Structures are given as structure tokens and as C-alpha cells.
Amino acid sequence: LTAVQTGDELDIGGRTLKFISAPMLHWPDSMFTFLAEEGILFSNDAFGQHVCHSKRFDKDYSLDYLLREAQKYYANLVTLGSPMLRMKLQELTDNGLLEQIKMIAPCHGQIWKNPAPIVEKYSEWGSPLPRQQ
């Protein structure tokens, strides 16, 4: 048994898992895992929604509905971790992973096959700057 941390990689038979620690994005031991060859970010508690449906992907539901549910989820579970969220989004950008993400698979809710809208919303919701209404 080996503990992993940010920057560690694990080859699992021709596929590479890259690890990004994300403490206090809901839990102290939170971590993102990126499956490099497929472009899938397993985001733990980030980018989720509190919904449970038989269809798994964002494309099966209206974007407005999923973003409303994601905003409620963010408000209840992620808001206190907004400073860490901003750091993690910047880290994903700085190490070139953000543009490689083709899909986000959170622990809760639908899988984002089109991750751009939820990443944009998380950037907005996590911003410390006031927004005009």
C-alpha cells in the first residue's frame, strides 16, 4: 500500500492515473484522479450534483437543470472550499491538464461529457469578486 500525492502517477497497464490532492473540497483527504489517455477527470466531490437518474451523462438532461442542481450542490458542499477550488483550477491550468479534460466524472450526479460549462460555472461560483445582478 502506497499513499499518493499531487504529481504522482500510476501506470495501470498502459494507462496512466495522475493524482492531484484537493484537501477540503468537502473532505480533508479529497483528491482528483486524471486518466490521461482518456482525458477523464475523476473529481471526487467537485463538479457534482445531488441527483440520481438512470441515465448517467450530462447530454441526457437539460444543461439548465444540471447547472441549477450543480449550483445547489456547490452552495451546500463546496462553498467553504472555494479558496482551494480556485487553487486547484489554477493548478490544472498551470500543469496543462485543464485543456486535456474531455470528461469529468464526479462522485455525485451526472458525468460531464462536455465539461466546459461546469468548469466555467465553478470558476464563477468560486470567484471572490462580487458579480453584478
Residue locations for each model-derived region?
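Terminal amphipathic helices with adjacent charged low-complexity linkers/tails
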Residues: 108-131
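Metallo-beta-lactamase
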Residues: 16-114
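Generic preference for hydrophobic/aromatic residues in regular secondary structure cores
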Residues: 1-3, 32, 70, 133
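Active-site HxH/HxHxD metal-binding segment of metal-dependent hydrolases
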Residues: 1-11
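Short, surface-exposed, charge-dense and proline/glycine-enriched linear segments
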Residues: 12, 35-37, 132
